[in-house]
Amino acid sequence: MVSVSEIRTAQRAEGPATILAIGTANPANCVEQSTYPDFYFKITNSEHKTELKEKFQRMCDKSMIKRRYMYLTEEILKENPSVCEYMAPSLDARQDMVVVEVPRLGKEAAVKAIKEWGQPKSKITHLIVCTTSGVDMPGADYQLTKLLGLRPYVKRYMMYQQGCFAGGTVLRLAKDLAENNKGARVLVVCSEVTAVTFRGPSDTHLDSLVGQALFGDGAAALIVGSDPVPEIEKPIFEMVWTAQTIAPDSEGGIDGHLREAGLTFHLLKDVPGIVSKNINKALVEAFEPLGISDYNSIFWIAHPGGPAILDQVEQKLALKPEKMKATREVLSEYGNMSSACVLVILDEMRKKSAQDGLKTTGEGLEFGVLFGFGPGLTIETVVLRSVAI
């Protein structure tokens, strides 16, 4: 007879969880940041608010964003005028959009990841889906299972309303699943659509306007598993260690509330200060066991909540400008795509590392860190190990 401990030992993988493939997707509608204030104030019938428009123009100019991708087109917004007002009851209209678009965009990213992985989708054992865009039952995980033609007994995990830190959360969960279930192959999908947060401007709520200047739509998908099959599966990054923490004295730093008017976001001005104040402690906890204290010697993937957060983190840790290059590049080309952002940065980094002829997927370096920041204020930390190219 086999003991329980022997069964448990047999269930565990031998090696660390490894990212085996990455796919990304964005809506076709591309919005140039330089002309967005004109479009935004026109479509929301707010052109008479000239001072507010000038403020918004300055926000967009300082955002370090060149372009974003959005499901919401001029045509869709004209058909749904309640979405263009500030705080008008519009949840039904928003839900009708995202319940369809979140799985559709997620599928696009997942198909690319599965293709790169090179294995039949019947080998996917677990599915993690994450979105801050809408809520439904059965959820986006169920819809994706159907859209992709996955087996009905795939083990599903649906994460709704987590916010911008959740790109780290899905990696942490995927790591635990892959390492504790021998042979598991986890499909991770983050899909974000700003149709829930778009609304017209308000003179009294400038934090809402900040969101209108930063957020974009996008999806990212990964295949995660331990003990890659030689010659068939090609590792991209290994996951070494993960943590989640609530920053002290940060309550109300970032809040989101689902209301009749959609999802409202509230930001304190000092979010960059809270993040930079707590980041050193998170790094020491993560890298002291590895004997690493020079944070310029690792590669960096940070959720680009906005340029001010990146600036303060760089300053606090005396990071060289090139450390945040991949992060800033994604912010510039896509805006803040909430949970999908850090996964898109992972993809950009491994591609650029190969293009530049570097030795590893992590800009030629061995170890790196991935940070997610979001409501709470919650900080997710993931230590990554790159793979030789």
Curated annotation (Swiss-Prot):
EC category: transferase
Alphabetical list of SUPFAM superfamilies matching this protein: Thiolase-like
UniProt entry keywords in alphabetical sequence: Acyltransferase, Flavonoid biosynthesis, Transferase
CDD domains for the chain: CHS_like
Claim: Oxidoreductase is one of the keywords in the record: no
UniProt EC number: 2.3.1.74
Protein's name according to its UniProt entry: Chalcone synthase 8
Species for this entry: Medicago sativa
Gene from which the chain derives: CHS8
